[in-house]
């Protein structure tokens, strides 16, 4: 799929004159981020860059054309060039790019820089003809690339226009060398050497100066003048006279009169035919022109100096100088317009022989040959789909006439899959219905395999739209229709059957279906679907109470991601999300927090609405640590996102838990009541997310003292959990029931419920749900352990919980939130120094973190401020409290906590 000539730098530079004044300026290039060659066409930007880098070993060259505005193609070529420059140090990132397994160009570049950390040699990457890029996503990514790339790498850009790469900032910071047309234009000395090298009679200084002034040092025009002198046997003085009125607007006329008309008709025809190709080798040219002497013609033209650049490599790839290529295109369309379609059609066929359907489609479209486009899509469409050429495919399909599109069921199915793969689920049904109707009009019978593929696709759409009954019906119908050879659709249908059974609480049926999905997906190397199946299995095992088994299964998902370079796909965030939820329930908050932040990084280039789960987890972690100020910031994010978007109950239930826990900790009963007034009440609770939503409702009623409604919700929860054998949810529900019993002043019942919950926790390991209500159940746990009412395992678990609850309460106190500080400064026994020299809220926070053992750097990270700011806060609080050092600060904090009864 990739064109070798785009990654090879121009060769055969022996005819180019050495330009010491430019090379001298470039000696300092390793100390700069960017070297920019910027000038109009024909000033020798590419030649100068190639000459300068000719003796450099670590160079990657990328020749850009307009097809590279596709971000996927651009990043692939760029990484191949970078890999060449770094001796293969970016292989993993290149594989990610080739498989389109990255969430954003920024995240992919982060991986690139991580891979380059051990490569310390001076290296260069050239982006030749960057001016053709008009894709803002590419520009933004390259600005990020420039900002963060390692110091041993220098980016070299040739462009006709000023590229939007933050060059003004680089210029001000002296991080860029700019070679403009003033520098690239020949001076008189260079003009003299240039002509002396090409013209037998040489040139005098006055004539050189006159010629140089006529064309303002424009190298391409000087080259044309030299050609004119050689072929018309004129002196350079005579040539100077003929170009005295030369300007850019007259370039075509000048080239016709002084170069093109001097060629024989056969050569002119050959050049015009070949100019339909942006890049070419002898095989392409032979397929296009049917000339067996294609390579000989190319080489003779190169020797003739007709702006054909030989490129490095064994494939004998060439390209025209951009200016000359544009000129030839102009002549071709003016002189042989009747051949334009045939030439482009032949070019398309030639590119197909090179196994490059992307280029073939482009030429077939230029030939206005819809039938050929359809043939290419029929033959290569699914291959291109699997390789991530989605935008090219969709553009090609959309440009097909209706008769061509709807005469090919394979293409209409591909069109629907393109919509589904780009998350436009609401369009899939419409597209398939339109296709079926149009096929009927044309008397095209859709075989049962087509119907099976359509039903599998519609089943996926139905489950995405929260319609499990319809999804199950369609998926089972699809499986009855599809042959085993139609593996993609069978995998999707099998997955949907498993997911539906998961949603409706038939876990014993859901698990084997997801295991079968994983097996099929691995067998046919559909790794995204394999990862999805593993994640579904993990959630099912968690619901069944086999949390450790789920955790180990997640490890296999991480291995699959590593093996298949899936680090940047959204499903990676799903895995991190489920892992974070397990870690939170096991009270491994630091690891859960790390997973949440990694998830945000993966989704950085996706809509903010996708960040809800991560913020929900971060808020819950902060609440668990007693960091209510920090939790408040996450809560604001959550509330904003929930107002802006519509979410599945799985998402809203998780977010609502964090909201209610925060309001519970802050005593905001009005907020809880407002939430309860509008809360979704699912008809059943046969899966983990509906269970969570009903627990949220029960918790809200308990906080508000609405005990009858709380009792009803709890009875419904346990009934549904037992019917679906949701062991882990039964575990969580028992804890909520115990809290309800405490509020009802029924201590004996609360202890019975806690004892049962502890027994289930031996299987699930769920301790986080105890800890969030530690203040309520801590005393009961102590009584259970003191009276020897528990078995050995349960007693050990209860003792550990009591220790964690005590630690959490201490953690809350040492963070010195506003409520704690207000009570402290109004305490009758508080030292006078504290009362008369009040600390700011931030200084109290710093004191608490010092007491917790945080270093200055850790405090800065915790509060998200600069280290110098923390030093200022510490200096201020030391002065106000008459403290000499950190040890005294810890003692002071300890005394204040003891004063408050901690």
From Swiss-Prot:
Residue ranges annotated for the HTH luxR-type domain, each copy included: 832-897
Record keywords, A-Z: Activator, ATP-binding, Carbohydrate metabolism, DNA-binding, Nucleotide-binding, Transcription, Transcription regulation
Residues that coordinate or bind ATP: 39-46
Pfam families: GerE, TPR_MalT
GO biological process, one term: positive regulation of carbohydrate metabolic process
Gene3D superfamilies (alphabetical): P-loop containing nucleotide triphosphate hydrolases (3.40.50.300), Tetratricopeptide repeat domain (1.25.40.10), Winged helix-like DNA-binding domain superfamily/Winged helix DNA-binding domain (1.10.10.10)
InterPro entries: P-loop_NTPase, Sig_transdc_resp-reg_C-effctor, TPR-like_helical_dom_sf, TPR_MalT, Tscrpt_reg_HTH_MalT, Tscrpt_reg_LuxR_C, WH-like_DNA-bd_sf
GO MF terms, alphabetically ordered: ATP binding; DNA binding; DNA-binding transcription factor activity
Regulation of activity: Activated by ATP and maltotriose, which are both required for DNA binding.
Highest taxon of the lineage: Bacteria
DNA-binding region, residues: 856-875
Function: Positively regulates the transcription of the maltose regulon whose gene products are responsible for uptake and catabolism of malto-oligosaccharides. Specifically binds to the promoter region of its target genes, recognizing a short DNA motif called the MalT box.
Similarity comment: family membership: Belongs to the MalT family.
Subunit-structure text: Monomer in solution. Oligomerizes to an active state in the presence of the positive effectors ATP and maltotriose.
Name of this protein: HTH-type transcriptional regulator MalT
Record gene name: malT
